[in-house]
Amino acid sequence: MNKSGRYRWRTGFSVSTSKDTLAWYPALVRVEDLGTPAALVDLDVVARNTSRMGERASRLGVRLRPHVKTHKTIEAARLQVRGHFGGITVSTLAEAAFFAAGGFRDITYAVPIPPAKLPEAADLSRRLDRLSLLLDDSVVADAVEECARERGIRLSVFLKVDCGAHRAGVDPGLNDSVALAGRVGSSPHLDFRGILTHAGQSYRCRDAQEVRAVAAHERDVMVAFAGRLRRAAVRVDEISIGSTPTLAVAEDLAGVTEVRPGNYVFFDATQVAIGSCALEDIAFSVLVRVIGRYPSRRELLVDGGALALSKDPGPVHVDPGCGFGLVLTAAGEPVPGMRIISLSQEHGVVRCPHDLTAGQFPVGSLFRIVPNHSCLAAALFDRYAVLRDCDVVDEWRPVRGW
């Protein structure tokens, strides 16, 4: 990097993702020239992942409203919405404001809104064609309605439904849930969009067959609940579902109108373990250097710790010894048997499957680590080095904060 903190330019060209038309930018440094730890994004893999998931949504007959929380960048979001209607999903109001400034006009804030954030959300809604909020509580419904009434605006609202993840959402089997939907739907100050869920339990599956069953359950619960609401004279325009695992393997989404996958842009070690993708589909990794070598215990120390990889335990239900990520060479090839066995703030301990020979993996050697959870690891960096092959061709800056 130069003194400004940006990467040095060198001769070469690459395709920029900053615009829909092809533009050419000079390429940057090689991977081995980067400081570590560094967040790496493979541009061609991102483009392939976004294209495939978009095509899959179209084949299943559902509208794609991709989640942008994994990458939090304008560039990747533009790839996600290319060829689709342009709406996105966010997980923070900071993301919503950032993407609004970047030209996105239809945004769903997919976290139940607390009353304390309503003034900020209401102000932001004036800058958009639509900002949709989530709620699953009658007290919050009252607060959202009062906020809209006081400001003389209509706020768009989804009712969050629990389809088995048990993190948030109303129970679709309860009469109170129907009553809450009717309460929101009848308000002159609220625009009731419909019902929304996230099958987070899909991440606890062991293989694609189990994920496929979760996808079918997610669909069935939501379509049945929408039918119950309609019989109670509640208008339901949208049935919004989605996670990367379920959309990756779903076979039938009849009755669903919208899907909101997000992790598929990068994928990660967990997605490989549960059958959502192959290793070659992973677009995000963390570049680290060997800073210590301990042959007597077959261990290496690297300069990527919890603040570069996160401490997400990963798919321990599939592989109890998975460690904290997949270890690849600097060129992106797997290193069989290597495990990251522990992380502290700035240190990672890598266990080798065999004795270290003289000169093998010396201090200064580079590895790429595929994190267990790319959403968490990516959020730890303020910039990504965007690659084509081993050339850094761009730099993406994610939004941070809440």
Model-predicted segments: where are they?
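A charged N-terminal "starter" segment
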Residues: 2-123, 396, 401-402
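Active-site-proximal beta-alpha core segment in soluble small-molecule metabolic enzymes
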Residues: 67-204
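C-terminal accessory subdomain/extension
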Residues: 295-402
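Conserved, mostly hydrophobic/aromatic
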Residues: 46, 69, 99, 159, ...
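Active-site loop ensemble at the mouth of alpha/beta enzyme cores that anchors a bound cofactor
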Residues: 213, 245-327
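Active-site loop/helix belt of alpha/beta enzymes
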Residues: 156, 163-278
